[in-house]
């Protein structure tokens, strides 16, 4: 069983690192491995090392997938409209509520996948630039804690989110197959499909039913993995950007040496940093003249400013590539959470889990995006705090001016928005949940009123 999971899931590292504080580009590449695997399943190229001939087949298969989804979306829309039009009572129209979350996911997956394909050079540039920033060789204990902590969080979150969506697929797609097996063994079980497509033929006829069921299963897998791949990329980029912000903040805190005296107590963080510099670099830290420190500070501040500008620019690329999809995603999430909750409460039996798993996955996906958005905000604030606490008052006038300019920019904060409407943060998650709850209670009260009049 373990070997099967490793073959078709995500492989564990076969060897333990000999020196945990030594990092290479391979560690960075391994953080992208799960996402690249999911992208490969839906034929979306993203820094994949494949031949030119394979690239053509990948592109053809992707557009074949998109052609299917372009047919699926209108088919579901027509089915929902016809179901609502033909319904004689409110209870007959409840089928529409079951179809709404699925239709929303189809539209969202199409938008996300096209965005990844059309703007693939921008996504690859983000990957390559963050790779160039990745630390190589042995790092300090504090840097190791920053990097290893970020990678562990990313590993747990990415794998957890991946298997959460797989659980959704299994719970949502398996019931019709169980019913088919039951009929095969002689039981009187109804025929059911995953989704209610409008089709020009009767899909419940022999042979047609089996073919339609398999095609709908494939459509569901494509939709889910389109969404999963996009969400993973967003989390990956923000994870590495926030890691670089934290490493930059650590570097800023060690920019200036401040003598520990009666004014600077040894227990203060700045004093601890100065003592560490003294321990690492020796007594020459105290004996160097002003010219040495001016030259050193100029070189280090120049590198810090360039890195800060690069991170701001990369965050802007993330904003440009993801913001519109995030806006659609969050609007869609409120509706999906509302209708999934409605289906869980009033339509599904207690032992049915399809829409319950759908609800859990929708809540998890929204929280994941908001949590990494909050991490970006917090890491940019930590850089501003580091600039203020770095002992700049003990430096030359030129260095103080440079730090003041950086501090002024860092205090503005770095964040990603939903196309300018709201900032992606945990506060946004709270707003989405409140909105979904308002829709849910309104729909529930409307249903109770209609049921009472029957």
Regions found by a protein language model. Name each.
Residues 251, 346-353, 359-452:
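C-terminal transmembrane module of eukaryotic multi-pass membrane proteins
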Residues 279-308:
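Intrinsically disordered, low-complexity acidic Ser/Thr-rich regulatory segments
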Residues 2-99, 132-237, 243, 253-278, ...:
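Helix-loop-helix junctions within predominantly alpha-helical proteins
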Residues 125-135, 247-254, 299-317, 382-389:
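Short amphipathic alpha-helical coupling elements at transmembrane boundaries
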């Amino acid at each position: 069983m373990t070997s099967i999971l490793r073959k078709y899931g995500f492989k564990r590292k076969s060897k333990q690192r000999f020196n945990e504080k030594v990092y290479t580009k391979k560690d960075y590449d391994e953080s992208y491995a799960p996402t690249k695997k999911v992208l490969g399943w839906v034929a979306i190229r993203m820094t994949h090392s494949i031949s030119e001939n394979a690239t053509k087949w990948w592109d053809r298969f992707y557009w074949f997938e998109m052609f299917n989804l372009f047919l699926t979306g209108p088919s579901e829309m027509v089915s929902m409209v016809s179901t609502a039009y033909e319904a004689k009572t409110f209870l007959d129209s409840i089928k529409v509520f079951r179809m709404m979350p699925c239709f929303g996911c189809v539209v969202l997956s199409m938008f996300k996948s096209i965005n990844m394909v059309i703007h693939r050079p921008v996504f690859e540039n983000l990957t390559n630039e963050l790779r160039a920033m990745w630390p190589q060789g042995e790092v300090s204990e504090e840097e190791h804690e920053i990097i290893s902590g970020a990678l562990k969080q990313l590993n747990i979150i990415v794998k957890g989110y991946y298997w959460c969506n797989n659980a959704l697929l299994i719970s949502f797609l398996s019931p019709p197959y169980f019913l088919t097996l039951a009929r095969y063994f002689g039981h009187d079980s109804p025929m059911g499909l995953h989704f209610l497509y409008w089709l020009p033929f009767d899909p419940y006829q022999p042979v047609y039913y089996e073919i339609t069921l398999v095609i709908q299963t494939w459509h569901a897998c494509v939709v889910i993995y389109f969404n999963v791949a996009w969400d993973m990329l967003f989390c990956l980029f923000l994870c590495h950007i926030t890691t670089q912000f934290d490493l930059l903040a650590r570097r800023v805190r060690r920019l200036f040496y401040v003598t520990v005296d009666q004014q600077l107590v040894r227990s203060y963080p700045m004093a601890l940093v100065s003592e560490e510099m003294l321990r690492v670099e020796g007594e020459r830290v105290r004996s160097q003249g002003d010219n040495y420190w001016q030259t050193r500070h100029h070189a280090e501040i120049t590198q810090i400013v360039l890195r800060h500008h690069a991170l701001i620019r990369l965050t802007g690329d993330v904003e440009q590539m993801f913001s519109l999809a995030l806006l659609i995603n969050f609007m869609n999430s409120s509706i999906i959470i509302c209708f999934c909750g409605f289906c869980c409460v009033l339509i599904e039996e207690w032992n049915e889990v399809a829409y319950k798993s759908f609800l859990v996955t929708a809540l998890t996906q929204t929280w994941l995006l908001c949590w990494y958005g909050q991490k970006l905000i917090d890491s940019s604030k930590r850089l501003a705090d580091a600039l203020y606490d770095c002992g700049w008052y003990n430096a030359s006038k030129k260095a103080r001016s440079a730090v003041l300019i950086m501090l002024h920019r860092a205090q503005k904060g770095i964040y990603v928005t939903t196309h300018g409407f709201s900032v992606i943060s945990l506060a946004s998650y709270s707003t989405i949940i409140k909105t979904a709850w308002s829709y849910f209670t309104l729909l529930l009260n409307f249903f109770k009123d209609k049921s009472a009049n029957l």
